[in-house]
Swiss-Prot record:
GO BP, sorted A to Z: DNA repair; DNA replication
NCBIfam families associated with the record: dnlj, PRK07956.1
Protein name: DNA ligase
Amino acids binding Zn(2+): 413, 416, 431, 437
UniProt KW keywords: DNA damage, DNA repair, DNA replication, Ligase, Magnesium, Manganese, Metal-binding, NAD, Zinc
Length: 689
């Protein structure tokens, strides 16, 4: 930590201004973008320096001081929800002395002679939430946001397994608060799926949980393995309990998930013993924790202590030290993904960190290497502070050998040697050689057979590599001729190393089974850049059948403006995605592949099971902020009733639902004489639909 004991007033003023800007930027990245720029340890250090400076120079405290803020101002993505009781963050304790000071402050504030019982519980590394129930029914779920105003995630929170939608014998009004998280193994599985689908991997479980929960489309959230714990109440019409331990017992009876690993302590020694127990056993827990939370157990004493601007006086978080290791960077290799994106990978001298032996770590992108000043043969720092996958935080410059080599981003693809292209807006380097690039070729086949695409069990990474190397397959189409090619081969697959009669028979059976495929899966399996499962479903819904899909794709490849505008009007599809689709279609082999696959596969027409309603087949546009319903929920309801939700107003639009601050879409609807209704009329419409 920076030595500020002897800092001058002028230096302190300058440093406080710098810290205010830095911490505000880090808050925005963490709370709004779900993309932390620094580790928790680095962030906590900056906040602590800021706090100590303000204590030394109270007359220098800034109007926008980080000590007055909780998180970050919320994004405009969701409907805003004001917390009736602010959801404040906790102050931090970094060592035993900080904890003793916390206990002493309680005694001094309340004028207690004896130790007041402290309730201790793990600090879950997830996303804070609030859920409000009226007469036992869940009516609002919200994120913490900036502590005063959060985001409405009601539709998303309802998708979490075992999250109560209704509570028996509940008070008229009940608010619970807690943490939503993803377990370690679920996180690893999720990242595997992300990789198979050609999507960016999540940096850590917290990012994955936050990114999953803050989806405008709740159906995406529903597919993610989110879990939760409740740990406190907010607004309630009646007192549920007189202490923290009693409250958790009551909430558990209501059906909420409560963390059983907690302890009511009656001395400082018991506090420290519990902290050491969790610190020692944290790796054995299925979820990530980054410390222990200490709260005054008695609610009456909590009320007496109250709050300061940023946090409650009656609670603090005792943080674990970051798990850090140091090892040598042997080399940097470059991987080529399915869509041609290049990713630098650090090859390391094996090191055990956090109970895991690490020999490789992603460097994310080439700008990261420059920003962190990492060179080959450097001794680099690895950290696991809430991360399942260790990350390189930087190089030990003082130990830098004389023979280090600065890494230079490649100009040519390491797989096919074609010229590479830099994509500034995505901060990536890409190979555009498509199927002529062996690495993309391999990754494309891997994607084609993956679980959420054609779902051909028995064709994993090793099997695909083997079949390509032996010349048995060279593109997705060849998979369906594997039986024929194998029969014509001099050496049969079942006689080769790693294979047998039963495994080959099982594989061929799975290939045959996969020939019956839904249109969304088929479109997703093609591996078009930015066409994930959700966008594949959007396209399938628009086209309805394979025949219509291929016909429209051929028109699009010929720059047909009508089909371009039609697709551009779909919610979720825009210019950027259309450019990627056209780039895919510009490769003649891709159109041919789609046609040939269409000849041998049974591609089922798109069908969505829903009751007929007055909205079936209607094109609906939502504009402005709806006062009581989130955009995700209103869109899901419309689609469930058979409507198509469009992103813009056109002459084909049947209905416009206008909320607060509706803009150009509302004006255009008036010009085109399209029916316009408000939220209240919409609720009546769907009730009677």
């Amino acid at each position: 930590m920076q030595n500020i004991d002897f800092i001058s007033e002028a230096e302190a003023k300058k440093l406080l201004e710098e810290l205010s800007c830095k911490i505000a930027a880090y808050n925005h990245a963490y709370y709004i973008e779900d993309n932390p720029l620094v580790s928790d340890a680095e962030y906590d250090q900056l906040v602590n320096i800021n706090l100590k400076l303000e204590q030394q120079f109270p007359h220098l405290v800034l109007e926008n001081s980080p000590s007055k803020e909780v998180g970050a101002k919320i994004a405009n993505k969701f409907v805003k929800v004001t917390h009736q009781v602010p959801m404040l963050s906790l102050s931090n304790a970094f060592d035993e002395q900080d904890v003793r000071d916390f206990v002493d402050r309680i005694k001094n504030f309340l004028r207690l002679d004896e130790f007041a019982p402290i309730f201790c519980e793990p600090k879950i590394d997830g996303l804070s939430f609030s859920a409000i129930y009226k007469n036992g029914l869940l009516i609002t779920g919200a994120t913490r946001g900036d502590g005063y105003v959060g985001e409405d995630i009601t539709a998303n929170i309802k998708t979490i397994k075992n999250f109560p939608h209704k509570i028996d014998n509940a008070p008229e009004c009940l608010e619970v608060r807690g943490e939503i998280y993803i377990e370690k193994q679920d996180f690893l599985n999720l990242n595997e799926e992300q990789e198979e689908q050609g999507r960016d991997q999540f940096a850590n479980p917290r990012n994955a949980a936050a990114g999953s929960l803050r989806q405008l489309d709740a159906s995406i959230t529903a597919k993610r393995p989110l879990k939760y714990f409740v740990y406190s109440g907010g607004v309630t019409e009646q007192n549920l309990a007189s202490s923290q331990d009693q409250l958790l017992t009551k909430l558990k009876k209501f059906g909420f998930s409560v963390n059983e690993i907690s302890k009511l302590t009656k001395s400082e020694e018991e506090i420290f013993a519990f902290y050491e127990y969790l610190k020692t056993n944290r790796e054995n827990l299925p979820y990530e924790i980054d410390g222990v939370v200490y709260k005054l157990n008695d609610f009456e004493l909590q009320n007496r202590m109250g709050f300061i601007a940023r946090s409650p006086r009656f609670a603090t978080a005792h943080k674990f030290p970051a798990i850090i290791g140091q090892t040598k960077l042997l080399s940097i290799t470059v991987q080529v993904g399915r869509t041609g994106t290049l990713t630098p990978v650090a090859e390391l001298e094996p090191i055990e960190i956090g109970g895991v032996t690490v020999s490789r770590a992603t460097l994310h992108n080439f700008q990261e290497i420059v920003r962190k000043d990492v060179q080959i043969k450097d001794y680099v720092f690895l950290q696991r502070a809430g991360d399942v996958i260790p990350k390189i935080t930087g190089a030990d410059i003082e130990k830098r050998p004389n023979d280090t080599i600065a890494f230079e981003a490649p100009l040519f693809c390491p797989s096919c040697n074609s010229k590479l292209y830099y994509v500034p807006e995505d901060i990536i380097i890409r190979c555009d050689n498509g199927l002529n690039c062996p690495a993309q070729h391999y990754e494309r086949i891997r994607h084609f057979v993956s679980k959420n695409a054609m779902d051909i069990a028995g064709l994993g990474r090793k099997q695909v590599e083997f079949l390509i190397a032996k010349g048995l397959i060279s593109n997705p189409l060849d998979i369906f001729f594997l039986k024929k090619n194998n029969e014509a081969s001099l050496i049969k697959l079942e006689n080769m190393d790693g294979w047998g009669q039963k495994s080959v028979e099982k594989l061929l059976k799975n290939i045959e089974k996969s020939k019956n495929v839904s249109l969304p899966r088929f479109i997703y399996a093609l591996g078009i850049r930015h066409i994930g499962e959700q966008n594949a479903k959007l396209l399938a819904r628009e086209f309805g059948s394979y025949n219509n899909f291929i016909a429209q794709m051929e028109l699009l490849s010929k720059n047909d403006s009508d089909i371009y505008q039609k697709l551009n009007n779909l919610e979720g599809i825009g210019d950027k995605i259309l450019i990627d689709i056209i780039a895919f279609l510009d490769v003649k082999e891709n159109i041919q592949l789609i046609k040939k696959l269409g000849e041998i596969l049974n591609i089922e027409d798109y069908k969505e099971t829903r009751a007929q309603s007055s909205l079936t087949g209607k094109i609906v546009v939502f504009t402005g902020s709806l006062p009581t319903i989130s955009r995700a929920e209103v869109k899901a309801t419309a689609e469930k009733l058979g409507a198509k939700v469009a992103a813009s107003v056109s002459s084909n639009t049947d209905l416009v639902v206008a909320g607060l601050d509706a803009g150009s879409k509302l004006q255009k609807a008036k010009e085109l004489n399209i029916k316009i209704i408000d939220e209240e009329e919409w609720l009546t419409l769907i009730k009677n639909a």
